Amino acid sequence: MPLKLKVNDAVATVDVPPDTPLLWVLRDVLNLKGAKYGCGMGVCGACTVLVDGRAVRSCMTHVGAVVGQAVTTIEGLSPDGLHPVQAAWESFDVPQCGYCQAGQIMTAAALLARTPHPTDAEIDTAMSGNLCRCGTYPRIRQAIHEAAGAVANK
């Protein structure tokens, strides 16, 4: 049975079983490669996307569960240029290997949408489910603080 999804403000109809992981639909059906497969168990955060503004692990979310909700991937985070979090990521040279970055950025964007001026503790709590094998955590925190001002002024 075809499922109608709203992904990055566009409607897409996909013909997959409703228990298919959202990550596979995004990557293999819709050709949106930003969200990455890391662990397949929802613990690394590389596959994080937004569903109605909430950060979710797309490897553990069935596509049928997001019908009627807005899915945003890194490709759709800011269609008119860089989102403030993306700009701050560049400014603070956060990426090294880059594998985790889409998930990190999506989690940070969700945090700033609900907590415009987070403390270090709030950042650490929100980002704790996103692993970075390169260890750029201090730069991630700095970038989120930098982006907070830009997001609040948007």
What residue spans do the PLM features occupy?
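Signature of N-terminal electron-transfer/Fe-S-associated modules in redox systems
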Residues: 1-154
